[in-house]
Regions:
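Mid-core helix/loop region of P-loop NTP-binding domains shared across ATPases and GTPases
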Residues: 82-85, 96-141, 150-154, 192-197, ...
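Conserved catalytic network of the ASCE P-loop NTPase/AAA+ motor domain
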Residues: 37-40, 65-69, 115-120, 132-137, ...
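Walker A/P-loop nucleotide-binding motif
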Residues: 41-61
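Walker A/P-loop
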Residues: 56-72
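Short hydrophobic/aromatic beta-strand immediately N-terminal to the Walker A/P-loop
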Residues: 45-48, 75, 127
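Helix-loop-helix "sensor" segment of P-loop NTPases
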Residues: 115-119, 150, 159, 167-222
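A short, basic N-terminal segment
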Residues: 1-41
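Conserved NTP-binding/hydrolysis module of P-loop NTPases
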Residues: 8-11, 71-73, 81-100
Length: 223
């Protein structure tokens, strides 16, 4: 393997790099800070980026930084997610068996979240990955879920994460206006520029333990 050839202790460019070792651009850190605010204030947020721009890395970092004594994080990633399976997925993660009808499952989830907030004194954060693949019916359901106690409070923070088309080809359209009006924060991760790309590579090579110069300036320009 190339790791031995270059004297590496760890593989530098893989998914399982520890969150604290991941490179963070200025845009990444700003978005991470915004998501922390979203979690604390129990808001509805949308995060988009082109493939390879750091969405999965952001989610991992966001999850790792939320204090476990203060938050319960629920995560779903299913391109065929329907409203019924949305509630079932969340209730399963909370250790509950969902009821058959969607409305009953929604009330069941809201009641459980009230217990979590009132008894455990924790806040719930729901992350939905690959959200650009969700159908309109499911996206609409988030609006209904967050309309709670006569719209006086949000039962949880909801973070939709997806490719750029989630915003450009769906949420910006008039048919999604009701959903868009509920969104409290929209963030996008841009492509890394030349300087950031060099810093990204240097950071991961440092994590690998490699002391050799592997990437020349010309190679970095090509990347």
């Amino acid at each position: 393997m190339y790791e031995a050839f270059f004297g590496m202790e760890h593989t530098p460019f893989v998914r399982d790099v520890p969150p604290e070792k991941l490179y963070e651009s200025n845009a990444f850190r700003e978005t991470l800070g915004r998501l922390s605010y979203v979690a604390d204030r129990q808001m509805f947020a949308v995060v988009t980026a082109d493939p390879g721009c750091g969405k999965s890395t952001l989610i991992r970092r966001f999850y790792s930084e939320l204090p476990k004594e203060d938050y319960i994080v629920l995560y779903l990633s299913d391109s065929k997610l329907t409203p019924r399976w949305f509630y079932k997925g969340l209730l399963d993660q909370l250790g509950l068996e969902s009821r058959f009808y969607r409305g009953d499952s929604k009330r069941q989830l809201q009641q459980e979240i009230e217990i979590i907030r009132g008894v455990q004194h924790k806040k719930v954060v729901c992350i939905l990955d690959e959200a650009h693949l969700l159908e309109k019916e499911t996206l609409e359901e988030f609006r209904f879920l967050l309309n709670y106690r006569f719209d006086s409070m949000s039962p949880m923070a909801v973070v939709l994460v997806g490719q750029t088309e989630l915003w450009e080809n769906k949420l910006k359209l008039q048919r999604y206006a009701a959903v868009r009006q509920r969104i409290d924060m929209y963030c996008t991760l841009p492509h890394l520029d030349r300087s950031e790309t060099e810093q990204y590579i240097a950071s991961h090579m440092d994590y690998s333990g490699c002391t050799q110069e592997v990437f020349t300036a010309k190679a970095l320009d090509e990347i």
